[in-house]
Amino acid sequence: MPIEDVLLDLKHKIEKNLPAGVTITDVEFEGPQLVLYTEEPRKFADDGNIIRNLAKELRTRIAMRPDPRVLATPEDSISIIEEVVPKESVISSYYFDPDSGEVIIEAEKPGLVIGKHGATLREITKQIGWIPKVVRTPPIKSRTVKNIREFMRNNLKERKEILKTVGRKIHRECTSKDQWVRVTALGGCKEVGRSCFLLSTPESRILIDCGVNVGSDENMTPYLYVPEVFPLNQIDAVIVTHAHLDHQGLVPLLFKYGYEGPVYCTPPTRDLMVLLQLDYIDVAAKEGKKIPYESGMVAKTLKHTIPLDYEEVTDIAPDIKLTFHNAGHILGSAISHFHIGDGLHNVVFTGDYKYEKTRLFDPAVNKFPRVETVISEATYGNANAFQPALKDAEKHLQMVVKNTIERGGIAVIPAFAVGRSQEVMIVLEESIRKGLIPEVPVYLDGMIWEATAIHATHPEYLNNDLRKLIFQKGQNPFLSECFKPVDSHEARQKIIQNPQPCVILATSGMMNGGPVMEYFKAFAEDPRNTLVFVGYQADGTIGRRIQKGWKEIPMTGKNGSTEMLKMNMEVQVVDGFSGHSDRRQLMEYVKRMQPRPERVFTEHGDEKACVDLASSVYKKLKIETRALTNLETVRLL
């Protein structure tokens, strides 16, 4: 059936289900949702169940757009909104978009603008006609969030056309009578880095992640040139499980070589993805490395990105529904559940996950409506890869920092900008506040402060305890005075040239570049100082070499020659802060999964870890398993 006939049929069905006196003028697909156009937005606002009931009846996401002729002026609208919304919400800005009929309201306390069960939003629509969308005013100023919001506002018309094209492709008619499901491993199997998979059916091709192996020049990119993937315009959608570069660093490259479809991720992942992609190409340029794409491709990716919240069931292809669930790995990290066909098959891609409550996040979700196949990470899949309890890890970190400070030294902590940094920040803030370690400045360098600002913008993605602390007690640990952002080369040099006892968190986490290397060069030869590892160190990185006990580290000198740097500083590995599940948690995650899966495939770990985990799941849980290898295709159904 042609798409115009599909829309006409939907319009007739909607009109039959609307209450008496409520009318629509048109319907159109915008991305995964169906948009209803009406001259009577106030009637829809009167009854909050109209849209909900239609969505349930049609089994699709529905949004409403008002006719521009029935909208109040922006000036009158602002006056009315400020009468309806409590002043305690602290509204900081408005943006009116006549094309969509939406008013974007930025407020410090979005919940007060929304009201109980959306009552205040409906009241706003009843009085002004506009559809209010609420975003949080970042409690810490974020250039990334500010620029993304401005960019999206400035490109609304183009984005609307993109969404229209995407929507029509999603809702096209299924033509194949065959029924099969396959997964192709394109990267990240029996290795850590360049994660990428293709989920295929007779109707659809979905790319899950497209990462870069930052620790390797030879095996940096996934196998995107294979016939299953290329040309890229045959892919229906790209899914990004989380914002680390080894899962999303090459998504803009897809657009450079012909991809024009949607990118699905959570809202925090979108913000962090932009931050890390721009930093990635900036660092590559400064280090004289090949730049895989320009900043314009990052912008194009952003235009095509469709953010989805957890638990939001969404059509992404004619025969596939996607639902994101909390993965507990980093901010916005998602376990991706794919419902294929009409109950034909269900696949769960875990991405990276943590099956334990941490300072930042709740444990990874492992309860689903249905699941037959699980594709699980195996970073710590080795039989002896057990991590200490988080409380023990925190005590270890406190002891290391305390001892270093008391002997007049500096604790340098290489950390990813996203995830471990914020976990460590919360522990350090509490430790200083309670007097468990001396009160010293904690310097944050290399995007860590900007990433922290994005965390503060999305508190609803943090765990319950942290949300209560922020919302109910008004205590935001990220705003502590002990944290000192390092926002320039001059500020960094001041710390290096005038060394005083302190803690330095700096990127990159594996010491393969970034400002941490400047601190390392400056402080490595002083035995009073300590290098503290709190995250995974991949093979081939300087971090892994130091962990192996190297006492002389080859470094590039000022004239480009190689110089050997003597390692006199203490080296401490504080296990337990990892955002990955350890061996015990990996096994428990599968063991406690509901319903019980039929098969489990392992990936994202070295060969021994992937094989060992797969073998143990098979032997102990009696579930079919396989350690996937790059470039192999497995039929699931």
Swiss-Prot record:
The record's cofactor note says:
Binds 2 Zn(2+) ions, which are required for nuclease activity.
User: What keywords is this UniProt entry annotated with?
Assistant: DNA-binding, Endonuclease, Exonuclease, Hydrolase, Metal-binding, Nuclease, RNA-binding, Transcription, Transcription regulation, Transcription termination, Zinc
In short, the EC number is 3.1.-.-
The region called Metallo-beta-lactamase C-terminus is annotated at: 579-637
A Pfam family of the record is KH_TffA
Q: Does the keyword Cell cycle apply?
A: no
List positions binding Zn(2+) 1.
Answer: H242, H244, H329, D352
Q: Where is this region: Beta-Casp?
A: 384-578
Needed co-factor(s) = Zn(2+)
Question: In UniProt terms, what function does this protein have?
Answer: Terminates transcription on the whole genome. Termination is linked to FttA-mediated RNA cleavage and does not require NTP hydrolysis. Cleaves endonucleolytically at the RNA exit channel of RNA polymerase (RNAP); the 5'-3' exonuclease activity of this protein degrades the nascent RNA released from RNAP.
Q: Which NCBIfam families match?
A: arCOG00543
Q: What is this protein called?
A: Transcription termination factor FttA
One record GO biological process: DNA-templated transcription termination
Annotated region KHa: where? Answer: 4-71
Question: How the protein assembles, per its UniProt entry?
Answer: Homodimer. Interacts with RNA polymerase (RNAP), interacts with the Spt4-Spt5 complex.
Query: Which intervals of the chain are annotated as region Metallo-beta-lactamase N-terminus?
Result: 180-383
GO MF annotations, alphabetized: DNA binding; exonuclease activity; identical protein binding; RNA binding; RNA endonuclease activity; zinc ion binding
